[in-house]
Amino acid sequence: MLRGWGGPSVGVCVRTALGVLCLCLTGAVEVQVSEDPVVALVDTDATLRCSFSPEPGFSLAQLNLIWQLTDTKQLVHSFTEGRDQGSAYSNRTALFPDLLVQGNASLRLQRVRVTDEGSYTCFVSIQDFDSAAVSLQVAAPYSKPSMTLEPNKDLRPGNMVTITCSSYQGYPEAEVFWKDGQGVPLTGNVTTSQMANERGLFDVHSVLRVVLGANGTYSCLVRNPVLQQDAHGSVTITGQPLTFPPEALWVTVGLSVCLVVLLVALAFVCWRKIKQSCEEENAGAEDQDGDGEGSKTALRPLKPSENKEDDGQEIA
């Protein structure tokens, strides 16, 4: 709604103008406004159309015109007794003075804000009095959604993926829809939040959690219900099977070959060691056999005949 009206002088002006209107009889003057709401984009100008049918000989000195908010009765703009009383709304409103004499009582509202949204009443008094209200709807288109993934790498089928759709600076609150690659609506595991900034415009963040398949496309649609304008965003996710890149494959093959060669070399060395050890053991055993035979010969006892001969020789 409109805010920030003027001080006591504005109130006096309103009461005076309304007093003039109330003294008039209701009847002949017919005020016409648009039945459909006037839609205005933020930061643009809007025209609230209001008209009446002046009778022959009509002069602006006979005209009393007031624009005010329907709900709060706060003054927006007035024209009384041939003088434009100006805007009580931050100097952002204006009439069409050259067209007043033709019955055009429309109001021009400049640099529309979110707080301007609401119903405005057009009061016209010449000799008789009539009024009508027109609605102003404020809108702002949403930006193209940005899509983010978490996690965003090393994705495998079966992983739980969080997809966030973000759109900014829109009004009024958006409607958010998710669909898969086949156009099937996704309503489960969706969380949407909308927060207004200092200007009253909304930032939208919608989160979808899905289990990743072999591949999939997910789209987010942010709709402005007043403008019937859709902003689209999509992301395609491919769950890659666990495979090796060519570089890693060659490294793996090279390491495997080196390992095989190392094992063969190690086996050959072990075989040589075992063979050498066996040969040394065999050689030692043969040496021990030769020494045993020599010892047996040296320790062989003398025969009796040999003892007798020795004895006889000693006697002789």
From Swiss-Prot:
Deleted gene: phenotype: Mice display a lower bone mineral density in cortical bones with femurs more susceptible to bone fracture, but do not exhibit any important skeletal abnormalities. Calvarial cells reveal normal number of osteoblast precursor cells with adequate proliferative capacity, but have impaired osteogenic differentiation. Furthermore, following cardiac transplantation, they display permanent survival under rapamycin regimen and cardiac transplants also show markedly decreased production of key cytokine and chemokine. The incidence of chronic transplant rejection is also inhibited.
Pfam families found in the cross-reference section: C2-set_3, V-set
GO MF annotation, one: identical protein binding
One biological process term in Gene Ontology: T cell proliferation
Disulfide bonds: 165-220
Chain residue ranges for the region called Disordered: 280-316
Endpoints of the signal sequence: 1-28
Protein family: Belongs to the immunoglobulin superfamily. BTN/MOG family.
Official protein name in the record: CD276 antigen
Organism, scientific name: Mus musculus
Protein's gene: Cd276
